[in-house]
Amino acid sequence: MRRLILFLLALTLLPIFRMPASAQMSNMPEDLRARLAEINPTWGKDILGNVATTLALYTPLLAAAPKDGVRIERDLAYGPDALHRLDLHKQEGRTGMPIVVFLHGGAYVRGSRSVNTEVYGNVATYFARQSMLGVNGTYRLAPAAQWPAAAQDVGLLVKWLKANASAHGGDPERIYLIGHSAGATHIATYLYHSDLQEPNGAGIAGVVLMSGRYHFDPKPDDPNLTNFQAYFGTDLTRYPAQSPINYVKAAKPMPTFIVISEYDNPDLDTQGALLFGALCERDRACPRFTRMELHNHLSMVYQFNTADDALGRQILEFIRRGR
C-alpha cells in the first residue's frame, strides 16, 4: 500500500521534480555546484563525513555574505532549561515584522543553533535582511530529554514570542516556523498533536518543514536508528501514537510548505511525500512542495543568505500569499 501511495504521489509531483535545476539554483556559483555534484551521490554512504565537507564549502561563502544592518541579540532564555535559548536577528527601527523561527536538526541527540559563527545564524540573518524578525532557536536533546520534550519546547518558544516579540519589533500574530530534519519533526509534532498547544491553538501563521520525519516506522538499516530510539524509545507499539502524520486529519488546517532535497537522508524524502499526500487528501488541495535539486540534506539549509536564494524567495512568497 505504501508503495502505491508513493507511486501516485510521484505522478502528482512529477512537474515539480522535472523543474530544471537552473530554475531553482541559477545563482549558485559554478565551483560550488561542481563540488556538490561530487559529494551528493555518496551522501547516504558517509553522512557525517559529507556533512563536514559540505559545511567546509559553505562556511567561507556565508562569512562573506551580506549582513549589514542586521543586529543580533544572543542567548535569550525562552524557558527554564539551559537549552531553552534563542537569538534574535533584526534590523533596528522596524515594527510589526513577520517573525520567522528556525529550528535546527541533529538526529534528536545533537545539534545547536550555532554550529559555527555562520551556521545556523545564516537562516535568521537572511530573513532579517528581508525586514522580518529572524529567530534562531535550540531545544532539549535526547537522551536527557525524550518525546515529546522537544515539541513541548516549540510550544514554549511560541509562547515566549507571543509575550515578547512586539518589544523587539515582531508581530506576534505572524509567527512562521521553519524546521529542518529533527527540527521539522518537532514542529510537526507540535502542530498536529493539539494536546501540546495552548487552549486557543498553535498560535502560528504557517510552517516550513524541511526533510523531517512524520511517520515513525524506522528500518533496521536506518543510519539514525539508535538516535531515533534515544528520543522516541524502542517500543514499536508507541510509534503510531507518536507519529504526527496520524493526527493530520483531525488537525486544524495550517499553511504548510514541505521541502525535501534531491540527495536526502534515507527515507526523509519519502516522508515529505507522505505528509504531502496526507494534506492533499485532507484539504482537497495540496500544500506547497519543493524538491531542491542538486542539494543535499545540509546544503539545503546552508544555502540561506548566499547568492543561491531560490528557496528563500519561495518562502517569502509563501509568507506573502499565506500558502
Positions of PLM-derived features:
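Mobile cap/lid helix-loop segments that gate and shape the active-site cleft of serine hydrolases
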Residues: L62-A65, G212-Y247
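Acidic catalytic loop of the alpha/beta-hydrolase fold
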Residues: F216, Y263-D267
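Short beta-strand element of the alpha/beta-hydrolase
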Residues: G96-A107
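Short amphipathic alpha-helix adjacent to the substrate-entry channel of hydrolases
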Residues: S114-V135
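C-terminal catalytic histidine-bearing segment of alpha/beta-hydrolase fold enzymes
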Residues: V259, T270-F276, C280-R323
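Primarily recognizes the serine-hydrolase "nucleophile elbow" in alpha/beta-hydrolase
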Residues: L156-D222
